[in-house]
Amino acid sequence: MSFPTIAHCIKSYTMIRYNYLCINEVDMINEVVSVKMPVKEKIRILKNHFEPENATGREARLSLVTGIHGDELDGQYVCYEVIRQIKAHPELLTGTVDVYPCINPLGMDMGARGIPMFDLDMNRVFPGDNNGAMAEYVAAEVVNDIIGSDLCIDVHSSNVYIKEAPQVRLNEDCADKLLPYAKIMNADFVWVYSSITVREATLAYSLNKLGVPTLVTEMGVGLRINNAYCRQLIDGIFNIMIELGIWQGERPAVKEPIMSTEGQVDFIHAEHAGLFVSALGEQMGHIKKGERIGDIISPVDGEILQEIISPADGIVFSLRENPVIYKGTLLARVYAVR
Amino acid sequence: MHKEVLFSVEGLYREDNEITGYRFGHGEKAACIIGAMRGNELQQLYICSQLIRTLKTLEEHGAISHNKEILVVPTVNMYGINVEKRFWPIDNVDINRCFPGDMNADSPKRIAKALFDSVQGYSYGIQFASFYMPGDFIPHVRMMETGFQSPSLANLFGLQYVVTRKPKPMDTVTLNYSWQMNGTNAFSIYTNATDTVDEKSARQAVSAVLRFLTRMGIVKYNNHSGYIASVIEEHELMPVKSDTAGFYKRLKEPGDPVYHGDVIAQVTDPYEGEIIKEIKSPTDGIIFFAHTAPMVMENAVIYKIIRRMHE
């Protein structure tokens, strides 16, 4: 008779705790860090760890992270589907995949972007601090757990105000290292932006500095799941897994993204307070110079206050979702080839 | 006193969010004082209101120095205060993370830009600030180590402590940082309240500002000369964390001396009422920050102690 290992004990516990069915032996749900709440509740940051049956420890490792912002839900579906596909075909797994589905569980439960008690943006506290307050402590433990990965993908869904086309965002400091991965992520658009100091406190920036190449994906809108965008990203993730030697399945067809480095991004802001009504319907995408993106209307006097016109031939990859706007509100981002 | 609207954000159904400035004296831009940047900073707004009331009287008595101008901005976020939201309520954005601002961007960045255009160029910038965690500080002056900070000037407020800290990435988009990088000597004043009004520490803050303005030759005001401050670096403050969760009873107040091994807090089981943890001081020193909420979660910082300092 063999004694169970600690890992098996944790697995058994988590299966009971979360009512997971053990349909195969490839996955193991671990607690990365936990914090006791004042009244009989523990907040747990979980990860689902997958490795091939005869793992040697030398396999490539991908970390998939999401839920840093509690109002971003597409990543939830992405995690579900990536896990489902790995579980359905464990024989195709030849590397390690760690899925961190929710770094800010309290925010997600409440539909809040930040940590609810402090209204604190968790993506401004990385790399964290083991001696710091709760958010910094959690951030430090998450970073420690991810270190050692060959690649990390941090999945975001904009916020409740702006809708985004599937895109990969890179800080120009890391562009050389990350562009080869970004190009095969099945994104519509890869946006390389200039470095801003405040972004140094994000998970992606911190991990890139600590030697873990990390991509940020943005798509959809807060508090919603866009199935089509999710499926697009899932194909991109499996494509990357194949590239890293982690997955032996059939390579999905992926699109070649438009690169921001070949053109310029125009930001269109409101000149009036009012209601923004989009003229683009459900889908963003290609637009001609002079075409209408939408109107700012006044519901009080029945007037159009401003017609929003595309400044160039290009693609609309960001669009205001919440119609209530003030002067200065970002309405759209249009990428135009130079 | 001259009252003016520095910037206005047009509302959809609400009246415009007007940022009002109060100018005292004329001439050289001497000092600028900013109150509530966040909608829950009621103490900070209250301190500004008391300061404006006092400066009005001083001006009527000719106590503002010749060729010196003081600008006081009680709040930039009237919209947030009126709906009890900390951040700019339309897109839930922290205005104090939008500096130096941008007039071609969203309304919080426009507010930041308009405010910064109005408040830069002053010799001294003073902001009444708040901390994101629930807790009380010993009233103190805080400055970031940008290379332009001046602890000796901060000492002239006459508060007990001056705290310096290395800026984190998120600090680089605050008003204080932008002020310092643009030639203004910038100070943040922390009192021991945020979303409630604490009269005693508000009076202390008003006195500290008037003491500073007097010492810089900007106003003539006769008040107690205050303390010679101890200057401490934030990383020297020893954090004490709770290693469990429940009802929280703090046994020490900011300013209290503690000795190694003293019981400084108790955590009680929220259902059964038993004391489940007595938290002991890990060092001798003075309590600088103390958690205030009636409950505590695991790993929360409940105290910060100035080590090896005595009353």
How would you label these PLM feature ranges?
Chain A
Residues 2-338:
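Structured catalytic-domain cores with a bias toward divalent-metal coordination
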